[in-house]
Amino acid sequence: SLAEHGSLNDIDLHIRDITPHPLPGLPLDVTASIFGKADANAKVEDIALGIVHMVLQTIGQGAVFASLNGDIKNIVLIGNLTRLPQCPDIFPRLEDMCDVHFKIPEYAEYRTAIGAALCYIRNREYKDIFCGKC
């Protein structure tokens, strides 16, 4: 894919672009602004990687934010996006910074469909028990 041949160095603004010194909890290579350095001359491969990075960062940060009000430290990622080759680079960084653990189970790309099927079966069983004719 295009994204596999891209670089974020000319797309995302990193902490190192703002200061030469690491900030507490923010290493120099962490993204400060997604697409913060992109311009009209950016390579298509870099833009593709920037989009993939943005999507995965948003998913990861959304999951982290959703876990903040509870004791959730383990986050399971499922669906086709888990097959993107950029996942092993992005989620471990979030784990280090946010004190959570992301788990991508085997066959993660099928887990959404399996969950929908189980929900359908369980709901149907529930209706059969409590509604009689449903």
Residue ranges and their predicted role:
Residues 1-41:
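Conserved ATP-utilizing enzyme core subdomain
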Residues 24-74, 109:
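Adenine-nucleotide phosphate-binding core of ATP-dependent small-molecule kinases
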Residues 29-39, 85-98:
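Acidic-glycine-rich active-site phosphate/pyrophosphate-binding loop
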Residues 42-46, 95-103:
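Glycine/charged-rich beta-loop-alpha catalytic/anionic-binding loops adjacent to active sites
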Residues 53, 70-78, 114, 126, ...:
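C-terminal, charged interaction/regulatory segments at domain termini
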Residues 60, 64, 92, 113-121:
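Predominant activation on well-ordered alpha-helical scaffold segments within soluble catalytic domains
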Residues 64-68, 72-94, 105-109:
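Glycine-rich phosphate-binding loops at beta-strand->alpha-helix junctions
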Residues 103-134:
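Glycine-rich phosphate-binding/hydrolytic loop that grips phosphoryl groups
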